[in-house]
Design a protein with these regions (language model features):
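Glycine-biased, small-residue-rich flexible motifs in mid-sequence functional cores and linkers
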Residues: 11-176
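A short structural micro-motif
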Residues: 4-5
Length: 176
């Protein structure tokens, strides 16, 4: 299944593993914020499609927001992504409809790196209507998931996905 979708598995021992140290508390990491509890556990592994994750995530900002994006929200998202792209920031989002889709699409149009963090297995394009977007992202950026191939999207997985989006970026911009 991984080979069919062009994915690979990485672990914390992989050279491609991103720097999660500032966000996750593990192995006695005293630098992680003390307010984090169980949700601050680093993933054991990640499934990846596209460019090496450490490279694309090195200078990244999350751009996220509502699924029901307004015309103003679309315009604001595109402007934010354009400004970040001018300074070579990678755009990270969850691949959902709304602001996430606008952010990824704008990044691709501006030829800046983008990372889609899936709330399902790496072999499952969700939402289905964004399948072409995920394929474009995998060609020029990176698609990742902490869920095993074959894992379907479930409500609780979106929260876990959001934690990963926040952990791998220098900051988060919430549009609408």
């Amino acid at each position: 299944t991984m080979e069919r979708c062009g994915a690979r598995l990485i672990t914390p021992a992989s050279k491609e593993w991103p720097d999660f140290n500032r966000a996750f508390r593990f192995f006695g990491n005293a630098e992680a914020p003390a307010t984090f509890h169980g949700e601050a556990i680093s993933p054991l592994c990640l499934w990846v499609r596209g460019k090496p994750l450490k490279e694309t995530a090195a200078q990244s900002v999350a751009v996220v927001g509502t699924r029901a994006v307004s015309p103003y929200g679309t315009q604001a998202t595109r402007k934010i992504v354009a400004d970040l792209a001018k300074h070579q920031w990678t755009i990270v989002s969850g691949g959902a409809l709304g602001v996430d889709t606008v952010a990824h699409s704008a990044a691709l149009e501006m030829q800046t790196s983008t990372i889609a963090v899936a709330a399902c297995g790496i072999d499952y394009d969700y939402p289905a209507r964004n399948a072409p977007l995920f394929h474009r992202i995998a060609q020029t950026g990176t698609v990742i998931s902490e869920f095993a191939p074959g894992t379907t999207p479930q409500r609780h997985r979106f929260l876990s996905r959001n934690r990963l989006v926040a952990a791998m970026t220098a900051g988060t911009v919430v549009v609408e």
